[in-house]
Design a protein with these regions (language model features):
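Hinge/lid segment of periplasmic solute-binding proteins
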Residues: 88-144, 274-279, 343, 426-430
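Extracytoplasmic/periplasmic solute-binding protein
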Residues: 125-143, 162, 167-211, 217, ...
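Paired acidic/hydrophobic, glycine-rich loop segments that form the ligand-binding mouth/hinge
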Residues: 83-86, 253-258, 274
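Long, aromatic- and glycine/proline-rich binding clefts that accommodate carbohydrate-like moieties
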Residues: 324-386, 414-430
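A ligand-binding cleft/hinge motif common to bilobed small-molecule-binding domains
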Residues: 91-96, 257-272
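Extracytoplasmic/periplasmic substrate-recognition and gating elements
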Residues: 151-153, 227, 233, 267-333
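Conserved N-terminal structural module of periplasmic/extracytoplasmic solute-binding proteins
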Residues: 3-4, 8-9, 22-93, 321, ...
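Glycine-centered hinge/linker elements that transmit conformational signals in sensory
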Residues: 170-177, 210-239, 266
Length: 430
């Protein structure tokens, strides 16, 4: 079933022999599921309701730190209490480094025989290895594009809204401007705009988030953004936090934002708006998913139950319930959205299309910066403000802000994270 399972059983047998603690094996069918997600009272109650249809599950919400400490301690002891682990992608490199997780490649193959999973997310679960599946993707949240249907008539000839390029988005925005006399593309500069820069623009043009920060490709990207896109961005964008209100008010016709900050537009007027994936650049279709995965520790007392529960969590029916009740989007194909609100169903289609794009390039939230995570956001925002709003020299700005970025990486020791290639030690800019 699981690769390396023999190793775990040998350890457990040694423990049993030495201590007589036969209780390390699970009795009955109970599965203990520890998760860093759904750890508020309201969310955990909803999660338990979903899990109740599987059977006897002990759902244990946890913060990341205590979960890691527990799994490390149980690995060292050779016996455990946790069967299934649910956590953000960024938790799994730590668990992999401690060597506490089964390789789930065989289980993944079984699941993929039944359901379609985004290949980009499957690769993330390998954590840079060739064939060791540390986790199987469970659910996602992300940022997408939205447009009023009145804007569709201005799409460039031959453009596919589900496979746009950044150049086509700029041409679309220009066409709208030429026809209406107004800049109608909206960006949440006062909101989560740093994620737009980190997870969408930079990966699409440079192939990474960090290493290519000051490269020739980055310079070309900023030149394009400043001259070809920004002139057609609504001037009030610098004050926009959420894009759903400007869309509903008709101030903008096309917008980028987090799904949670667009949902009101789709729910209130589903007949007026469409959702679609972010555009692609020369290096791919950069996008920033919040990927949550499921893993099974070597010390799981009930690994068979963990496998069955993992399969249950990835069934289209369960994925639909998680979306409806807990607002995380599915990672499997075939999810029935007919019972969901119109807005959620509209967004789900775009989220799925984005993750399953052949050129999908997932850019993960910064990893390894600890309490200084906010500093990287300021560096990208400063680059934007200085280049686009203040008109400073692009290369000069990138050299200066790049030095700040490298200092942050060096001082925290943060290794590179996807889509940048793994690094030994602190991530280094090119």
């Amino acid at each position: 079933m699981f690769r390396h399972k023999v190793r775990a059983l040998v350890v457990l047998l040694v423990v049993v022999t030495l201590t007589g603690a036969l209780g390390v094996y699970a009795q009955g069918g109970k599965v203990t599921f520890m998760s860093t997600q759904f750890n508020t009272v309201e969310e955990s109650d909803k999660a338990r309701a979903i899990l109740a249809d599987f059977g006897d599950v002990d759902f244990v919400p946890s913060e990341e730190g205590p979960m890691i400490d527990l799994l490390k301690a149980e690995a060292q002891a050779g016996s455990g209490t946790v069967d299934l682990v649910g956590a953000l992608h960024g938790t799994f490199p730590v668990l992999a480094q401690e060597d506490v997780l089964f390789d789930l490649s065989d289980l993944l193959a079984e699941i993929q025989a039944e359901y379609e999973l985004p290949e980009a997310f499957v690769e993330l679960g390998k954590l840079g290895t060739e064939d060791y599946q540390y986790y199987i993707p469970w659910m996602q949240a992300t940022y997408i594009m939205a447009a009023h249907k009145d804007a569709l008539q201005y799409l460039p000839e031959g453009a596919d809204i589900n496979a746009l390029t950044w150049e086509q988005l700029a041409a679309w925005a220009k066409n709208i401007y030429d026809a209406t006399g107004e800049a109608k593309l909206g960006l949440p500069v006062a909101g989560l705009f740093h994620r737009f820069l980190e997870g969408y623009l930079y990966p699409s043009f440079t192939g990474g988030m960090v290493t290519g920060f000051k490269t020739a490709e980055a310079v070309a990207m900023w030149e394009w953004f400043k001259s070809d896109l920004w002139p057609y961005v609504h001037p009030q964008s610098i004050a926009y936090e959420f894009m759903q209100e400007p869309l509903l008010a008709g101030e903008v016709l096309v917008a980028f934002d987090h799904t949670a900050r667009l949902i009101n537009a789709f729910n209130e007027r589903p007949e007026d708006f469409v959702a679609f994936p972010a555009p692609a650049g020369p290096a791919g279709r950069g996008f920033m998913p919040v990927v949550v995965g499921l893993g099974i520790p070597f010390t799981a007392p009930n690994p068979d139950g963990a496998e069955a529960l993992l399969k249950y969590m990835l069934s289209p029916e369960t994925q639909a319930r998680v979306l409806k009740d807990l607002a995380f989007f599915p990672v499997v194909g075939g999810v029935d959205t007919s019972g969901l609100s119109a807005g959620v169903a509209i967004e789900a289609g775009a989220v799925s299309a984005q993750a399953n794009s052949p050129d999908a390039l997932p850019a993960l939230l910064p990893v390894g910066l600890g309490s200084r995570g906010g500093e990287i956001n300021e560096i990208y925002r400063n680059a934007f403000s200085r280049i686009v709003l203040n008109g400073e020299d692009i290369q000069t700005v990138l050299e200066q802000e790049g030095a700040n970025l490298q200092k942050l990486l060096d001082e925290t020791g943060a290794p590179c994270w996807p889509p940048d290639a793994p690094s030994e030690g602190a991530c280094q800019l090119q």
